[in-house]
Design a protein with these regions (language model features):
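Rieske [2Fe-2S] iron-sulfur-binding domain
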Residues: 2-129, 175, 186, 195-197, ...
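C-terminal catalytic domain of Rieske-type non-heme iron oxygenases
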Residues: 8, 32, 108-398
Length: 398
């Protein structure tokens, strides 16, 4: 959650779902954020209905009270004053950084790793915007859309009057149409200390090469090229095996964003309708266009104006195809090709890290090197034979 969602001390708690657990977040009287199991340890009533007061969250069922670390402070229904000492709510450590609440769900006795130095995580509030939306599928199949550059010229393309696919160029993105014209990009995929860099080479009109560079950062972060001075990154937060909350951050490293650029702070995706947010985690950030109405596909628009026929909103278009795979796609039925090299490499990197942790207790790559996350997506045009890694070194820095 964002810090502002929890409000001032002793404000109302908020439901949170994370890694399949139902939790409740609150800010105590001293301003410390607590993240507890939603179930009261007494009889399982939801602490969401609790009273946040005087240094803890009090269950309204029998008045038991817990602090931000899960310690039971009071059990007023019990005659023994020492009874509370043997009761504890499951609690997870939280850290606030620049308007975002981060939680550590690892072993309670372990040392939490430092927070990654993601560009958006350190940008000033006035320099960034936030979009949040739900993806009703597994987090990895959703994330893979950001490392799959080949789909851009198909799914997101428009149709001109001749029936040709187009992604019209803009003043702040003059090479945008190249992804719709060169549909077979040449990929160069490179591992780095915190993930994978994906560079897609397409032919430009004048014989040069247009390079579109994206980043995968372990385990749930991506960054793709944005327009103009803006930078863009996402966090694909697993609510459970079949639901993902996408945090999209756009930021300018040095200047405040305009009102138009920051309109996403309310959690709305430009160009698409969204239901009013409820407090239930699986109702937050739901598109009006969904599986229930076939994502409002318009077959006439598909024939004349839009390759997909879906709304002119990339997140909605991505949701339609990714959710259509099912909650967890059966990857044993896939037929991967050369254009899927980045998908293959990201999966391999995740599997290698998971096995190393399981078999030898080896921490995932980059976890103790927060500076290795200072990478972002970018784009540039180079002459044939130019070294894209050297030419983009500065551009890739977040």
């Amino acid at each position: 959650v964002e810090s502002e969602e929890l409000g001032p001390p002793d404000g109302p708690p908020r439901r949170v779902r994370l890694l399949g657990e139902n939790l409740v977040a609150f800010r105590d009287s001293g301003g410390q954020v607590g993240l507890l199991d939603q179930r009261c340890p007494h009889r399982g009533a939801s602490l969401f209905f609790g009273r946040n007061e005087e240094g803890g969250l009090r269950c309204v069922y029998h008045g038991w009270k817990f602090d931000s670390e899960g310690r039971c402070l009071e059990t007023p229904t019990e005659p023994s004053e020492t009874f509370a000492r043997g009761v504890r709510a499951r609690a997870y450590r939280c850290v606030e950084r620049n308007g975002v609440v981060w939680a550590y769900l690892g072993p309670a006795a372990a040392e939490a790793p430092p927070l990654p130095d993601l560009g958006w995580a350190v940008a000033a509030p006035e320099n960034r915007s936030t979009l949040t939306y739900l993806r009703a599928c597994n987090w990895l199949q959703a994330l893979e859309g950001d490392v799959d550059t080949a789909h851009l010229g198909w799914l997101h393309a428009r149709m001109d009057e001749t029936g040709r696919r187009r992604l019209p160029a803009r003043a702040d993105d003059p090479h945008r149409d190249k992804v719709a014209q060169d549909l077979s990009p040449v990929l160069s995929v490179v591992d780095h200390s915190a993930g994978v860099t994906i560079a897609a080479r397409r032919n430009d009109d004048d014989g040069r090469h247009y390079w579109r560079i994206s980043q995968f950062l372990m385990p749930i972060f991506t960054s793709v090229p944005a327009t103009g001075r803006l930078r863009r990154a996402k966090a694909w937060v697993p609510l459970d095996d079949e639901h993902t909350l996408v945090w999209e951050r756009n930021w300018d490293p040095s200047e405040a964003l305009s009102v138009e650029q920051r309109r996403g702070r309310a959690g709305r995706v430009p160009g698409s309708g969204m239901h009013d947010d409820g407090d239930e985690p699986l109702s937050r950030g739901r598109f009006v266009a969904s599986r229930d109405n076939d994502y409002r596909i318009d077959r006439e628009r598909q024939r004349t104006a839009s390759f997909s026929g879906l709304e002119e909103s990339a997140p909605v278009q991505d949701a339609a195809v990714q959710e259509s795979m099912g909650p967890i796609v059966d990857r044993s039925r896939e037929h991967l090709g050369a254009s899927d090299e980045a998908i293959i490499r990201v999966r391999r990197r995740l599997l290698e890290a998971a096995r190393a942790l399981r078999d030898g207790g080896v921490e995932p790559p980059g976890i103790r090197s927060p500076e290795s996350y200072r990478l972002r997506g970018c784009q540039l045009v180079l002459p044939p034979g130019a070294d894209w890694q050297e030419a983009s070194r500065e551009e890739q820095r977040a």
